[in-house]
Amino acid sequence: AKAAVNWEKSNLKQVLDRVDANGDRGKVTFFLENWFTGAADRWNADLDNYYLQLAAYMKSRGYRYDQWIVHCFDEVLNDKFLNGAKNIKRLDPQIRIFSDPPPATAEQLRPFLPYLDCFCLGSWFLQEDANNGNKAVELLRSTGKPLWIYECDSQPRHPLNNYRRMALNSLQRGWDGFTFWSLTGLQFRHASITPPEGVVNYGMTYLDENGVRYPSRRWALWELGIDDYALVAALRQKGIDVSGEIRTMCGTKDAAALDEAMEAFKKEKLKAFIPGEK
């Protein structure tokens, strides 16, 4: 018999316990990232054991399959990933698998579609695909599976205009979400990683000498984007179409102008949720 995974000493247990302690169960989807799957020379019995026990553990904690997803290959579409995804689905077809693919053609993506459950596309993927007629994005949209947009780094030198606008970019496309990969910055997550010379990879928060973390202006704007996204989603649930307004705001050129436009939009559209207002 295969050895049992000691979940009692795992980071996963700590995270699940913390979510329960905060009263946040049901409010989050767990993104279960591991690198040992991709690092293995080939698929093996230990991986079989891990994924079967992972599914059993999440079930024992009261979580449905739609409340967690596995990320085990990063920015690749290679044979090892395809084989790994097939094996995970062989073990348990309900385990969901996440992908943040590199720029790819529809033909490169097609073999993966039966095995992957959520796609998160970087701006570089979208730019290259736009040059090729948007065929890859059209293929992914045809699956009906969740589509997100993301950026990797968040640096102080990047235009502030990028941060609130990301929500509008996702909304305009009719997609399901948006995120930054590095919310805290690589050197804060992994002390062994040194950014290339000239790159200040701080994410969107800062850590002081006492271990206290502070948000940046970039974080504040990204957080406003989350509010924008939630408002538009609520309006759509009411059957209120704001596609034209979203397109107009996406064309706004700088952060200050976008902020002014969005605040006016919110002030007007929030009336839809006030009894007696129109």
What is the predicted role of each segment?
Residues 1-4, 12-43, 47-104, 176, ...:
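Catalytic domains of carbohydrate-active enzymes that cleave complex glycans
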Residues 8-15, 47, 102-112, 159-168:
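Short, acidic/polar
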